[in-house]
UniProtKB/Swiss-Prot annotation:
Top-level taxon in the UniProt lineage: Eukaryota
Main location (coarse class): nucleus
Organism of provenance: Schizosaccharomyces pombe (strain 972 / ATCC 24843)
InterPro entries, per the entry: ARM-like, ARM-type_fold, CAND1/CAND2, TATA-bd_TIP120
Localization, UniProt: Nucleus
Function: Key assembly factor of SCF (SKP1-CUL1-F-box protein) E3 ubiquitin ligase complexes that promotes the exchange of the substrate-recognition F-box subunit in SCF complexes, thereby playing a key role in the cellular repertoire of SCF complexes. Acts as a F-box protein exchange factor.
Family classification: Belongs to the CAND family.
UniProt keyword Repeat, yes or no: yes
One GO term of the biological process aspect: protein neddylation
Leader sequence segment: none
HEAT repeat intervals: 1-35, 42-79, 121-157, 259-295, 365-410, 615-650, 680-700, 701-737, 738-775, 810-847, 850-887, 1020-1057
Name under which the protein is recorded: Cullin-associated NEDD8-dissociated protein 1
One annotated Gene Ontology cellular component of this protein: cullin-RING ubiquitin ligase complex
Length: 1220
C-alpha cells in the first residue's frame, strides 16, 4: 500500500526534503475522505510510532507535516492504543522535545470522533498530567502560556467528568492558579488561570468550590490589597460567565452568597483610589450579578442608583454639571461638538462610563419589573452620554435607551394593566404614568439632540440613532407627536442613499415604516423624501431590502389613501411607477415578485376613480396577464386580477380593455383544470369575477365552452365545488338550460361520490343551481336519484338537506305527501326510509305551512325500528327538527327521561341539536342535569360509546354557554365516583378540540387541578387523564408551563413496571403473566413523547433519555414509542446522545438482532419488522447528527447484516424528507 511506501521513504531517508515530501504526500492521501473512511491502522502497525518520532524531527517543516498526519489519523487510532498515544504526546510536551507535540495533542483532543473515548480517562490521566507539566515550566516562558491555553480549551470539552477529580489533583490545580496569579503580571495568563479554577470549581467535586469561596472572601475583604481584589474579581467574573453559558451547571455556591458579593463590590466601587481598569472589572461583575443572579435590587437601590450616576458621569478631565434634569437638554444642544474639546490618549475613564451604562442595560434586559425606577432615576444620566466624547460610550447609551423603549410596552402589558398589591407593597410602581411621563420626557430630549446633530458626528452613531428613532416611532406609548419633526429629521442625515451600507439602507426603510405606522399629520411634509428613498430601495439588488421597501410602500399607499384619497403627489406616483417597471423586468426573487404584484394591485384598488390613468391601468393588466402564465406567480396574479376587476367594473374605460379582458379569460380557461389545486382555486375565483364583469361582451359560443369546461371540472375536481358552483350560477340561464340534463347528471354523480364532503355554503349553492335549471315536476326524480348514493347515514344527511331545501324553494307539498307515503309504507326499502326520515328532519315546516309536531312524533316512532340505520337516521332527524322550536327541546328531554328509547340514540339527537343551536343558560343547565343524572350506576362506562356521546353533548353545552356550567364540571371531577371523574375528564378533553376563547382561563384553572388524577389508583381514571394531558399539550400548550416539573416527575414515576399491578393467571395447564397497568404505561410514554415538543423539555433531556432507554426493555408498543422519543432526542440534542451512546447502541443491537422464523406468526413477524425499522431510523438519525466513530462502526455492521436493504430504504426516506 502507498502509505507503507511513504512511511518507509521517511524512515530511510537522511534528506530533510525527501522526509518532508514523504509526510506531505502521506497527509494529502490521508486527508481524502473516502480513503480515510476505509483506512485501518492495523495494516500499518508502526505508523503511529513513526509519526510520533517525526514530531521531534530535526526539520521544523517535517514536524509540522507530522502534526497534520497525527491530527488526521487520530479518529482511526484503536481504543486500546488511544490512551498510550495521548500519554506519549504528554511525555513529549513534558520533555520539552518540541512544541509540535503540544499542537498534535491539542488537535487530537479537539477531534470530535475521539472525544467519547478520551472522556473516559481525561480527568484521571490527561488533566493531572497537564497540571504537572505546568508546574515544571517557568511562567515567563511562552510554552507555559501555550500549554495553559490547551488545558483551558480541553476543559471546555471534557469538564462533564470533573466530578471524579481526586483531591491531590485539585491541589495541583490550586498550585497552578497561585503560580499564575503571584508570579506573573500578564493579563491573559491570569485570565486563563481564573477560567481554569472556575471551571474545576463549577464541575468538580464539592471540596473544589470551598477553596474558591475562600479566595473570593479573602480577595473581596475590606482591607485587602488591590492586587488580590483584582484576582478575586477576575475569578468571580469567570464563574459568572460560565454560569451564563451553562445554565445547568451548579452555581449554588455563588447564589447563596450573591447578596454579600454584591455589597462588597458596591463598597469597592466607592473607593476613589481604585484604578479605572479595576473599576471596569468591578462593573462587569456587578452587571453579571444583576443579570444572572437573583439580586434583590430594591434593597441596594439607593446605593446602586447614586453609584451608577457618579460612574456614568465620571470624567476626571472635564468639570460639568450635567445631572440637573432642567439643564440636560441645553447641555446636549451646546455640546454638539463635544469630542473636539480636548484629546487625551492616556485617558481611559471612558471605559468606566461605558461599563456603568452596561450595568444599566443588564438591569433593563433581565429585570423588567424595575424599568420605571431605572428610567426615572438614571434616564437623564444615560441621555447625557449621547454626546460623550468617546464613540463607544455614545453607542452603548443609545443601546440602553433603545432597549428601555422596546421594553416599555411589555412593562405596561404585564404590570400596568393589573392592580398589583404586591408590587405596591414592595415599593414598585404599577401605574402607567410611572413610566409614560418619564419616557415622553426622555423622547423630547432625544428629539432635540437628533435635530442638532453635527455634520462631524460619526456615521456609526448616526446609524444607531436611526435605530433608536425607529423604536420610538414604533411605540404607541412614547408621545412622538410633539417631537415628530425633530426625530424624523434624522432621515435627512443620509443625503446619498446609493452610497450607504446595506444595513443602514434597511434601517432607513424600517424607520419610514415606523413613521407611517404612527399616523402623524406631519408625514405629508416628508412624502417626497420618503417616496424617493423607498423607490431607490425597491430598485436595489438586495432582495430583503426590496421586499421590506415594497411592504412599506404598500403601507404608505394605505396611509395616503386614508388622508387624501383623490390627490396623489408626483413623487408618490413616480415611486409606484418605478415598482411597476421592476415588475415588468425579470426579477429573480419570488418573494419580491409577489410583493410587487400585491403593491400594484392594491394601488389600483385604493385609488381607482372614473378619471384614473387608463394607460397605467392597462400596463398593470398586461403585466399581470403575463404573470398569470408564470407558474410561481400564477396564484398571486389571479387574485390580484380578481381584486382589480371587482373595483374596475367597466372594462370599456380601459384602453383596449375588451381585448385584454378576453386574453385573461382565455388564459384562465386554458389553465383552469390543468394546474394544481391551489392554482385551480385561484383561476376559478378569477373566472367568477370575470364572468360578473364582462359577461355581456362574451359570445354565446364562448359561454357554452366555459359551461362545458366547468362541468368537466366538476366531474374530476372534488376540492373546489364551491368555486365551480359560483361560476355556474353567473352563466345566463339560457346557456345553462341547453346543458340542463348533463349538468343535473354531473351534480348527482358528484353528490354520489364517496370522496365528496360538502359544507353549508356548497349545499346552498347546489340547491340554488338545481332549482334554477329544474322544474317542480323534475324534483321527485332528482330526489329519488339521491337515494342511490352508497353512503353511510351521517353523509346522507347532506343530501337530505339539499332535498329539503329544494322542496322549500318550490313550496312543494305534493312531494312531502309522496315522501310521507313512502315513509309510512311497510314495503319501502331501508335506504328510502332512511333518506325520507332525514329529509323530514330538515324541512322548514313554517315555510311549507305543515304541522311540524306530527312529523316529530312520526320520526320519534322510528327510534324503535328493527333496522339500525333507520334508528340512527331518526335520531339525527329528531335532533335537526328540535332546533326549530323550544317546544321540541322539552319533548326531546321528556323522551330521554322516559326511558322509552335507547339513550345512545337520543344522545345523537341532542348532539345534532346542540351543533345547530344556541341556547340560553337555563335550558343548558336543565339539559346538563338530565343528561348527567345517574351515570355512576352505568356499567363499563369507560369503554361505552355512551360516554363518548355524553361527553360531546356536555362539552357543547359548556362551549355554548361559556363559563356558566364550568362549576358543574369541577363538581364532577372532585367526586369520588369513578364514572364522574371519567366523564369530567372526557368532557374537558372534547372541549379542548373546540375554539372557545372565553374559556381559556377556566380551562387552565380546571387542568391545574385535574391533571393530578393521572396518579389516581383507578387505572381507567389515570388513563383518561393521560389522554387529557396529551390533548392539552397539542391544543392548549400554555396550560402546561406552571405544572411542567411536577408533571414530568410524575410521568417518570409511572414509566416503569408496577409489580402491584402484575399477577399470574391460570389458563388451563398454562400460566400467563398479566400486567394490568400496561395501557397506562403506554399512555405515559405517549405523553412523554408529546411533552418533548414543549420548549421547557430542553432543560430536562437527560430524564427523557433515561426513560426511553428503559422503555426499550418493555413491551412491543412501548418500545416503538421509546424509539420515537430517542429519534426526537437526537434532533433536539445530539450531544446528550453522545454521553449514552454505548447504552443506546446496545439497546438498538438487541432489537436489530431480532429474527423471524418459519414458525413466527404473521402478527409477530410484522411487529418485529416495525421495531427493527424504527431502530434503524434512530440509527441513521444518530449517524446524521452525531459525529461519533462508534456509531459509524455499528452502522457498517448493520449494512452487512440481514436488514441492510431495509436500512438503505430508511436512509432514502429520511433524506427525501429532509430535502422536502
Amino acid at each position: 500500500m502507498e502509505e507503507g511506501i511513504l512511511l518507509k521513504k521517511y524512515v530511510e531517508s537522511s534528506d530533510k526534503d525527501i522526509r518532508y515530501m514523504a509526510l506531505s504526500d502521506l497527509a494529502a492521501r490521508l486527508n481524502d475522505a473516502n480513503h480515510l473512511k476505509n483506512l485501518k491502522l492495523e495494516s500499518f502497525p508502526d505508523t503511529l510510532d513513526v509519526l510520533l518520532q517525526a514530531l521531534s524531527d530535526a526539520s521544523p517543516e517535517v514536524q509540522q507535516e507530522a502534526v497534520r498526519c497525527v491530527a488526521i489519523i487520530s479518529s482511526k487510532i484503536p481504543q486500546d492504543k488511544l490512551k498510550s498515544t495521548v500519554e506519549n504526546l504528554l511525555s513529549g510536551v513534558a520533555g520539552k522535545k518540541s512544541k509540535n507535540y503540544l499542537s498534535a495533542l491539542s488537535l487530537l483532543l479537539s477531534n470530535s470522533n475521539v472525544q467519547p473515548f478520551v472522556n473516559k480517562f481525561y480527568t484521571s490521566t490527561v488533566f493531572p498530567s497537564f497540571l504537572q507539566i505546568l508546574k515544571q515550566y517557568n511562567v515567563a516562558q511562552e510554552e507555559f502560556f501555550a500549554i495553559l491555553c490547551v488545558v483551558c480549551d480541553s476543559l471546555e470539552i471534557y469538564h462533564s467528568n470533573l466530578s471524579t477529580l481526586l483531591p491531590n489533583n485539585f491541589e495541583l490545580c490550586i498550585d497552578v492558579f497561585q503560580k499564575c496569579t503571584t508570579q506573573c503580571q500578564r493579563e491573559l495568563i491570569i485570565k486563563k488561570a481564573c477560567y481554569l479554577l472556575s471551571d474545576v470549581s463549577l464541575y468538580g467535586p464539592r471540596f473544589a468550590y470551598k477553596y474558591i469561596i475562600e479566595v473570593l472572601d479573602r480577595g473581596l475583604g475590606p482591607s485587602t490589597q488591590m492586587s488580590e481584589v483584582n484576582i478575586s474579581i477576575k475569578l468571580l467574573n469567570e464563574i459568572l460567565l460560565s454560569s451564563k453559558k451553562e445554565k445547568d451547571s451548579s452555581t449554588s455556591f455563588i447564589s447563596t452568597a450573591v447578596a454579600d458579593y454584591t455589597n462588597k463590590i458596591l463598597s469597592l466601587l466607592k473607593k476613589e483610589e481604585a484604578p479605572d481598569e479595576l473599576t471596569q472589572k468591578l462593573l462587569e461583575v456587578l452587571g453579571l450579578l444583576l443579570e444572572y443572579q437573583q439580586v434583590n435590587i430594591l434593597k441596594i437601590w439607593p446605593e446602586l442608583h447614586g453609584l451608577l450616576i457618579s460612574k456614568i458621569s465620571y470624567d476626571p478631565n472635564l468639570i460639568s454639571d450635567t445631572n440637573d434634569e432642567d439643564d440636560i437638554a441645553d447641555f446636549l444642544e451646546e455640546m454638539s461638538d463635544y469630542s473636539s474639546i480636548y484629546e487625551d490618549e492616556e485617558d481611559v475613564s471612558w471605559i468606566v462610563r461605558r461599563e456603568s451604562l452596561k450595568v444599566v442595560l443588564s438591569v433593563i434586559l433581565s429585570r423588567l419589573e424595575y424599568l420605571p425606577i431605572v428610567l426615572q432615576a438614571l434616564g437623564t444620566s444615560v441621555v447625557s452620554k449621547l454626546n460623550d466624547r468617546e464613540e463607544s460610550v455614545c453607542l452603548i447609551s443609545i443601546e440602553v435607551l433603545k432597549q428601555a423603549f422596546l421594553h416599555v410596552p411589555r412593562w405596561i402589558e404585564v404590570y400596568a394593566t393589573s392592580n398589583d398589591r404586591k408590587r405596591r407593597y414592595e415599593g414598585l410602581p404599577s401605574d402607567r404614568s410611572a413610566i409614560s411621563d418619564t419616557s415622553i420626557y426622555l423622547v423630547s430630549v432625544i428629539g432635540k439632540h437628533v435635530s442638532k446633530l453635527s455634520d462631524k458626528t460619526p456615521l456609526s452613531i448616526v446609524s444607531e440613532l436611526l435605530n433608536l428613532v425607529t423604536v420610538i416611532f414604533s411605540s404607541r406609548d412614547l408621545g412622538v407627536q410633539s417631537e415628530f419633526s425633530n426625530l424624523s429629521s434624522i432621515i435627512y442625515r443620509f443625503p446619498d442613499f446609493s452610497t450607504l451600507d446595506i444595513k443602514i439602507k434597511l434601517n432607513l426603510v424600517r424607520l419610514i415604516s415606523a413613521i407611517i405606522s404612527c399616523g402623524c399629520e406631519e408625514i405629508e411634509n416628508m412624502e417626497s423624501k420618503m417616496s424617493t428613498i423607498l423607490s431607490l430601495a425597491v430598485q436595489n439588488n438586495y432582495p430583503q431590502l426590496s421586499y421590506e421597501a415594497l411592504i412599506t410602500e404598500l403601507s404608505f399607499c394605505k396611509y395616503i389613501h386614508k388622508k387624501q384619497p383623490t390627490n396623489v403627489s408626483t413623487d408618490f406616483s413616480t415611486m409606484i411607477d418605478s415598482s411597476l417597471q421592476l415588475l415588468e423586468s425579470k426579477i429573480s426573487d419570488l418573494k419580491v415578485r409577489l410583493a410587487l404584484i400585491d403593491l400594484v394591485s392594491q394601488y389600483v384598488i385604493l385609488f381607482y376613480e372614473p378619471d384614473f390613468d387608463s394607460i397605467f391601468l392597462r400596463r398593470v393588466l398586461i403585466i399581470l396577464c403575463k404573470k398569470l402564465q408564470e407558474e410561481p406567480t400564477r396564484s398571486a396574479a389571479a387574485r390580484a386580477l380578481c381584486d382589480i376587476f371587482m373595483s374596475v367594473t367597466d372594462i370599456t374605460k380601459i384602453e383596449n380593455g375588451t381585448k385584454i379582458y378576453e386574453e385573461i379569460l382565455q388564459d384562465c380557461c386554458r389553465h383552469i383544470d390543468k394546474s394544481g389545486n391551489e392554482f385551480t382555486t385561484a383561476y376559478l375565483e378569477l373566472l367568477e369575477v370575470l364572468l360578473k364583469v364582462g359577461q355581456k361582451y362574451l359570445a354565446e359560443s364562448l359561454l357554452e365552452h366555459i359551461l362545458g369546461l366547468l362541468i368537466e371540472t366538476l366531474k374530476r375536481n372534488t376540492e373546489n365545488t364551491v368555486a365551480i358552483l359560483k361560476c355556474l350560477l353567473i352563466i345566463p340561464l339560457s346557456i345553462l338550460l341547453k346543458s340542463k340534463n348533463l349538468l343535473i347528471d354531473t351534480i348527482i354523480s358528484h353528490l354520489q361520490s364517496s370522496t365528496i364532503h360538502l359544507n353549508e355554503e356548497s349545499v346552498c349553492l347546489l340547491s340554488r343551481i338545481i332549482a334554477v335549471i329544474s322544474k317542480e315536476e323534475d324534483l321527485e326524480l332528482i330526489i329519488n336519484s339521491f337515494t342511490c348514493a352508497q353512503k353511510p347515514v351521517e353523509e346522507m344527511v347532506t343530501l337530505a338537506l339539499i332535498a329539503a331545501q329544494l322542496i322549500c324553494i318550490f313550496q312543494s307539498k305534493a312531494i312531502v305527501t309522496s315522501l310521507n307515503k313512502s315513509f309510512m309504507s311497510p314495503k319501502s326499502e331501508v335506504r328510502i326510509k332512511v333518506f325520507t326520515t332525514l329529509i323530514f328532519g330538515q324541512l322548514d315546516y313554517g315555510k311549507l305551512t305543515l304541522p311540524a309536531n306530527e312529523y316529530f312524533d312520526t320520526i320519534a316512532s322510528n327510534l324503535n325500528s328493527p333496522n339500525a340505520d333507520v334508528m340512527k337516521a331518526a335520531a339525527i332527524a329528531l335532533g335537526s327538527l328540535t332546533s326549530q322550536s323550544e317546544k321540541f327541546i322539552k319533548e326531546l328531554c321528556a323522551l330521554y327521561v322516559s326511558d322509552a328509547y335507547d339513550k345512545e340514540l337520543l344522545l345523537i339527537s341532542f348532539l345534532t341539536f346542540l351543533k345547530k343551536s344556541k341556547i340560553d343558560y337555563e335550558t343548558a343547565d336543565k339539559i346538563w342535569d338530565i343528561l348527567s343524572k345517574d351515570i355512576e350506576n352505568i356499567k363499563d362506562f369507560s369503554t361505552s360509546p355512551f360516554r363518548t356521546l355524553l361527553s360531546e353533548c356536555l362539552g357543547l353545552l359548556i362551549c355554548n354557554e361559556s363559563s356558566s356550567l364550568y362549576y358543574k364540571l369541577e363538581l364532577l371531577s372532585s367526586s369520588e365516583a369513578s364514572n364522574h371523574m371519567l366523564l369530567s375528564l372526557s368532557v374537558f378533553r372534547f372541549s379542548l378540540t373546540l375554539d372557545c376563547p372565553k374559556l381559556k382561563a377556566y380551562e387552565k384553572q380546571f387542568f391545574e387541578k385535574a391533571y393530578k388524577l393521572f396518579q389516581n389508583p383507578d387505572l381507567e381514571v389515570s388513563q383518561e387523564t393521560l389522554q387529557v394531558i396529551i390533548s392539552v399539550i397539542k391544543n392548549r400548550r400554555s396550560c402546561i408551563a406552571d405544572v411542567y416539573n411536577e408533571l414530568l416527575q410524575g410521568l417518570i414515576s409511572k414509566s416503569s413496571v408496577d409489580s402491584s399491578n402484575v399477577h399470574v393467571v391460570q389458563m388451563g395447564p398454562f400460566q400467563h403473566v398479566v400486567d394490568n397497568s400496561i395501557n397506562q404505561r403506554q399512555l405515559v410514554f405517549e405523553t412523554l413523547y408529546s411533552l418533548l415538543d414543549i420548549p421547557e423539555s430542553l432543560n430536562h433531556l437527560t430524564h427523557f433519555l433515561q426513560v426511553s432507554v428503559m422503555g426499550l426493555e418493555d413491551e412491543h408498543y412501548i418500545k416503538l414509542v421509546s424509539l420515537s422519543i430517542l429519534e426526537k432526542l437526537v434532533d433536539c440534542s445530539p450531544s446528550i446522545i453522545d454521553e449514552q451512546v454505548d447504552t443506546i447502541l446496545e439497546a438498538l443491537r438487541k432489537i436489530i438482532e431480532l429474527r423471524k422464523t418459519e414458525k413466527t406468526l404473521k402478527t409477530d413477524s410484522d411487529n418485529i419488522l416495525d421495531l427493527v425499522r424504527s431502530a434503524l431510523r434512530v440509527l441513521f438519525t444518530m449517524k446524521l447528527k452525531c459525529d461519533n466513530p462508534v456509531i459509524s462502526e455499528f452502522e457498517s455492521q448493520v449494512q452487512k447484516g440481514p436488514y441492510s436493504l431495509e436500512y438503505e430504504g430508511i436512509k432514502n426516506e429520511i433524506k427525501t424528507t429532509i430535502k422536502t
